[in-house]
Amino acid sequence: FLNQSPQFYKQTAVAFFDRVFEIAPVYRAEKHATSRHINEYIGLDFEMGYIDSMYDVMAMETACLRYVMEYLKKHYAFELELLEADVPVIRDIPSVTLLEAKEILGNKGSKNKLDLEPEDEVAICEYAKKTFDSDFIFVTHFPSSKPPFYAMNSREDPRLAYKFDLLFRGLEITSGGQRIHDYQEQLDKMHA
């Protein structure tokens, strides 16, 4: 299989550099039959050390997106107008837990308890636009059985993980979370 991400190298490097950024080709090594995924793309990854919670990562992502959108509007106004691109204004990005998202969806949502299906993502983004006037929304606290083994389980409820997805206009555009930083805890989760 092709590597999807140098995840562990980045996590190791954080011990020395505090923040590690990478822009590189990503090759998906998973089966999927959807127009919502591509097998190869250029990805931007970052790891942060010495955080208190996944909300620190979400705040960093919000600030980064805000900067990029403002930069695009300032330096590429002609191109954006030519393409008739609608660049969103980013204030604070709202968040809901997966459980809250499922409650918002009610009977209209999918039966998948571990994740959101594409139609769920569209509906949650419509909710975010209507309720918060935001094109973006974070969905947090997925079941701990879903994310990769390096995602930290919630201290309040170990059945959940400190993991999030960022949705934008009906699509998941990023995912992230708080990593396990305790050696024994990591070993225990790997062996579970």
Spans of model-derived segments:
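Hydrophobic (often cysteine-bearing) scaffold residues that line and stabilize catalytic clefts
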Residues: 57-61, 97, 182
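Conserved hydrophobic/aromatic pocket- or pore-lining residues that grip, position, or stack substrates
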Residues: 2, 46, 101, 139, ...
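Metal-assisted phosphate- and nucleotidyl-transfer catalytic regions
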Residues: 63-169, 191-192
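Short conserved micro-motifs at the rims of enzyme active sites and ligand-binding pockets
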Residues: 13-15, 33-36, 55-58, 149-152, ...
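Class II aminoacyl-tRNA synthetase-like tRNA-binding/catalytic domains
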Residues: 1-49
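A generic structural motif
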Residues: 45-56, 170-172
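Extended C-terminal subregions enriched in glycine
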Residues: 169-192
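Beta-sheet entry/capping signal
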Residues: 1, 18-20, 135-138, 172
